[in-house]
Amino acid sequence: GELGEVSATIPLIESLREDRNVDVRVRAARALGRLGGREVVEPLVEALNDENPQVCITATDALIEIGDVATDSLIESLDSEKVNVRCDATRALGEIGNPKAVDYIIKMLKDEWVNVRIYAVTSLGKLNDTKAVPSLIEVMQNEKENDLVRAGAAAALGVLRDQRALLPLRELIMEAEELGELEDTALKSFKKIMAANWQAIPGAQ
C-alpha cells in the first residue's frame, strides 16, 4: 500500500471484503486508507459493518485519512441500523471536518443510543461551526440526558467559544448542588469563552 498505485486497490478490496482472516482484513483496510481515492471509499464504508471491531476501527481511521471524498458516504452511514456504524461514521465526520456534516451530526444528538450522542457532541466541537450552539446548549441543559453527553456538550461549547453559551453555562454552575465532572467542564468552558470574548462583553474590561 505504500506505493499508492491504483492497480493495488483491487486485490486489497477483495481481501477486505472476502478474507476470513481478521489480520488480513485489518491490513487491507489500513493500506486502502493510505492509497486513498474515491474507489476505495465504498469498500471501507462497507467494512464498518464487519463483525470484528478491530476491522471497523481500522476502516474508520482509513476513511478519516482519505478525508473529504468520504464525507457523503459517511453521512449516508449515519442512517445505519447498526449502532457501531453510526458511532464510527459520527466520529469520522468530526475528524474529517467537512462543514456539510454539521446538520446531520446535530440530528445524531437525538439518537437513542448514548454512545452515538457522545460521539455527536465531540464531533460538533471538532467541526467548529457555531450553528451547533443552540442544540449543544439544549443537550447540556437537559437533566434527563446522560451526564457524559451533557459534559461533552459543555466541552464542545468551550471549543466553539460562542457568547450565547455564557449564560446557560453560568446557570448550570450556579445551580449545581455539588461540582461534579459536568459542572467542572462547564466552568472550564465558561472561562474559555470569557477569555476569547472579553473585549466584546459589556463591563468585562
Q: Predicted regions span which residues?
A:
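Structural detector for internal amphipathic alpha-helices that build alpha-solenoid repeat scaffolds
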Residues: 1-5, 10, 14, 22-38, ...
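Residue-level detector of conserved, well-ordered beta-strand and adjacent loop positions
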Residues: 49, 137, 170
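Alpha-helical repeat scaffolds
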Residues: 202-205
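Phosphate- and divalent-cation-binding pockets in alpha/beta enzyme and binding domains
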Residues: 11, 135, 168
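TPR/TPR-like (Sel1-like) alpha-helical repeat modules
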Residues: 167-178
